[in-house]
Amino acid sequence: VMLRQPTMIKIGDHCSINHNNIFQAGRQTGTITLGNHVLTAANVMFVAYSHAYDTREIPIIDQGYYDAPIVVEDDVWIGFGAIILAGVTIGRGAIIGAGSVVNKDVPPYAIVGGVPAKVLKMRATDL
């Protein structure tokens, strides 16, 4: 597991973080917060910052970075090799399919997959 800016990362109780996970928090608002009972497969990446690119007249490398928080609520399962990008909230009980790139919020109890990740279906409700 690799932690960039570890003071910006909070992991809840009873989480299972598999090997090769990368947590890249930002320096200002790019916190990464995992709730309780979160399960990640191997090779998951959390990236709470990115290059700024708003001005065409300035090379991207010279424009700096922006960051935004990532929030993973309780009881979420994140599949192998998924990438969670800055500014995303993953709702309680959601499942993120293997290899997905999550660039938008995920509703509670949604099952998402793909690049970019889209809702495939909702988890069944209790009887």
What residues fall within each predicted segment?
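Residues that flank catalytic or metal-binding motifs in active/ligand-binding sites
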Residues: A42, A98, P108
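Flexible, glycine/small-residue-enriched loop-and-beta-strand segment within the central core
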Residues: V1-V88, V115-P116, R123-A124
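Short conserved catalytic/interaction loops centered on acidic-Pro-aromatic/His motifs
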Residues: H51-Y53, G91, P107-Y109
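Short-chain dehydrogenase/reductase
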Residues: S16, W77, I95, V101, ...
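C-terminal end-helix/capping segment
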Residues: V106, I111-L127
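Beta-rich strand-turn-strand
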Residues: G79-I95, S100-K104
